[in-house]
Regions:
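Nucleotide-state-sensitive switch-loop elements of NTP-binding domains
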Residues: 3-26, 31-39, 44, 48, ...
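Cofactor-binding loop segments of dinucleotide-utilizing enzymes, especially the Rossmann-like FAD-
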Residues: 68, 143-144, 201
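Phosphate-binding/switch region of NTP-binding enzymes
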Residues: 156-158, 165
Length: 223
């Protein structure tokens, strides 16, 4: 017989975070602000993808970006040069954002007059997938050089995302062991409802379809 108590800390943390995330999601819905949580590994092209996306949409809607990093404000500076509002969130060593940190950023930012807010999460394929940020939709970027086996190695990330961008398709000829068919099959096996776009943030390939997806989702959300 045990003479001590076992506390499931991880379960409690997730339960508390999920409740906070649901509350934040409801608040954003009442404001009509669509929050996209954008995730990837470091170097997959989040910021470059975001800059091209902003250039395509900023004349149609009011956009804001929250940049999350352990340190530095390089990405926030790059985004601010596009002309949209941007803030930098330093996570203090944390490898992800949770709902409370997202709420703090939202408060500082002020989103009531924004249609579309992108949260560029910390570059990591593990921790960000575990914590609900309160976002409307989750998106991730997988770059061709990372390999088509990433859905097998990081299944949770691919399971929780509404949309997956396969980036750097302009160098597919160099990485000829990357199979578009295999990566698509592996993603859909984990997540049959996921939308998948093959894109290049460098050339713009696939960005018309990606931008149309954003327009459609925001339109449905704000009705």
């Amino acid at each position: 017989m045990k003479d001590f108590k076992v506390i499931e800390v991880k379960r409690s943390i997730f339960e508390d975070n999920n409740a906070d995330a649901d509350k934040l999601r409801a608040e954003l819905k009442s404001e009509g602000t669509f929050l996209l949580n954008l995730m990837s590994s470091p170097g997959a092209g989040k910021t470059t993808t975001l800059k091209r996306t902003i250039s395509m949409l900023k004349d149609e809607m009011k956009i804001g970006v929250m940049e999350a990093d352990i340190d530095s404000d390089v990405d926030a500076q790059a985004i601010s040069e596009t002309g949209v509002r941007a803030i930098q969130i330093h996570t203090g060593g944390m490898c992800h954002l949770d709902a409370d940190m997202t709420r703090q950023g939202i408060r500082e930012f002020g989103t009531k007059d924004l249609d579309f807010v992108v949260l560029e999460n910390v570059g990591n394929l593990v921790c960000p997938a575990e914590f609900d940020t309160g976002s409307t939709k989750n998106a991730m970027i997988l770059s061709v050089p990372e390999g088509d086996d990433k859905p097998l190695k990081y299944p949770l990330m691919f399971s929780i995302c509404d949309v997956v961008l396969i980036n750097k398709c302009d160098i597919l000829s160099v990485f000829d062991d990357f199979s578009k068919e295999a990566v698509k099959e592996r993603i859909l096996k984990l997540n049959p409802d996921a939308k998948i776009f093959f894109v290049s943030a460098k050339t713009g390939e696939g960005f018309d379809e990606w931008a149309d997806w954003i327009r459609t989702e925001i339109s449905k959300y704000q009705k």
